[in-house]
């Protein structure tokens, strides 16, 4: 689902060789997930009989700050920490939390994982992530270079290694 809460919202569903994009108004994330369940369990795009067949759900979270250096299972504490990090991604993290909370309502106890876009870049050394500004801005506000779109960079890097038939550890790539 895209553009949840806007009149231009839509759902794209692909399964069994059938792909469809349908305009639909989703005022809330919960309503959007309910439509996702409907698409997955009925019609030409049916791919499961019931949500109990889903093993896990992944959520892309834009900013994990310095708290999250890898993906993790979502707990109430993880959601609260993502909420605390919202000033670092005020347009994305709050919307991501809405999606996580709605998914919890719709999908119940299915395990959910947060995949942080900033995690890929978490191994940068301080000389690469510190800005030439007063150090107290980093200490008080967490102002530093984080790196974004890490999930995409990781995917492209691993695909390049696969294509080149080289271990990723031996490659120096620009993605």
Residue ranges, per PLM feature:
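Phosphate-binding/catalytic loop of phosphoryl-transfer enzymes
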Residues: 93-175
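A broad, structure-centric signal for solvent-exposed, well-ordered loop/edge residues
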Residues: 8-11, 81, 89, 140
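Short, low-complexity, polar/charged sequence segments that are solvent-exposed and flexible
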Residues: 18-21, 76-79, 131-135
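Electropositive phosphate-/nucleotide-binding environments in soluble metabolic enzymes
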Residues: 26-30, 34, 72, 76, ...
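Short glycine/proline- and acidic residue-enriched helix-loop micro-motifs
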Residues: 20-22, 82-86, 139-143
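N-terminal glycine/serine-rich phosphate-binding loop of ATP-dependent small-molecule kinases
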Residues: 1-65
């Amino acid at each position: 689902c895209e553009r949840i809460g806007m009149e231009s919202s839509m759902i794209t569903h692909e399964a069994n060789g059938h792909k469809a994009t349908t305009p639909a108004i989703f005022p809330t994330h919960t309503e959007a997930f309910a439509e996702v369940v409907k698409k997955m369990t009925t019609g030409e795009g049916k791919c499961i009989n019931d949500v109990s067949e889903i093993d896990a759900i992944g959520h892309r979270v834009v900013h994990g700050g310095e708290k999250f250096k890898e993906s993790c299972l979502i707990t109430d504490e993880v959601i609260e920490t993502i909420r605390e990090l919202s000033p670092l991604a005020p347009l994305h993290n709050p919307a991501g939390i809405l999606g996580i909370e709605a998914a919890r309502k719709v999908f119940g106890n299915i395990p959910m994982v947060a995949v942080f876009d900033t995690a890929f870049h978490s191994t940068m050394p301080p000389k690469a992530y510190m800005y030439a500004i007063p150090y107290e801005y980093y200490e008080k506000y967490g102002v530093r270079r984080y790196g974004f779109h890490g999930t995409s960079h990781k995917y492209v890097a691993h695909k390049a290694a696969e294509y080149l038939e080289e271990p990723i550890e031996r490659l120096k790539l620009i993605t």
